Amino acid sequence: SDATYRLILERGQEDWDSEYGRFPRLFRDAESIPGLTWPTLTFESEMSVFLGRREVKLIRLGAGHTAGDIVAWVPDAEAMFSGDLVEYRSACYCGDAHLREWPFTLDAIRDFDPKALVPGRGDALAGRATVREAIAMTRDFVNTLYGTAELAVARGRSLKETYAAVREAMDPKFASFAIYEHCLPFNVSRAYDEASGIDHPVIWTAERDREMWGKLQG
């Protein structure tokens, strides 16, 4: 989407540098990587591509995991590829999220009533009931995260105290989810920011990573 292109312009290199700093093992022969991969075609709200006679609609339904998320909807199969807007038995990474808007974007996905959905993480889902379960599960994750952080901020809690409150609320339901432990510090940091009035996610840098860990461990 155009919104994702703007994100690449704004923070693409910083994100690359941050990920390399966190997970150098994933960047084998990093010096051979020529740089960011730039899109050659973008769209504002919706675009159709045709695979033979099959139409695939690329649609920006709203912000959530990032400001620029899209879904791919295959009308004749009633199937959707949701990207990280929907996860299944996996934690959502919310470090660049728009948490208050995300549930409304999930409403829009639900309104398509897909009979199959491929989430960002987790099993491919067959059957409307299972798809609805995944959407509800993602909604619960996002709402529990943000609602707990919002209450903590309203009570004047620190980031470290908010992290503890979020763990208490989320661990019983979500601690078994894939990548939960990895995502939680970044998720709480973003939820804390958004609840504090920082609507646009702050760019992640190595310095910001260190600052976050200092506050959580201090």
What residues fall within each predicted segment?
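Charge-patterned, long linear interaction tracts outside catalytic cores
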Residues: 42, 47-54, 59-68, 202-218
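C-terminal regulatory/interaction regions
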Residues: 154-218
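Metallo-beta-lactamase
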Residues: 3-60, 76, 106, 113
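Hydrophobic/aromatic beta-strand patches that form the interior of the parallel beta-sheet core
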Residues: 41, 80-81, 118
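Short, well-ordered beta-strand elements within core beta-sheets of diverse protein domains
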Residues: 90-94, 151-154, 192
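Divalent-metal (often Zn2+) His-rich catalytic cores of metallo-beta-lactamase-fold enzymes
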Residues: 101-161, 165
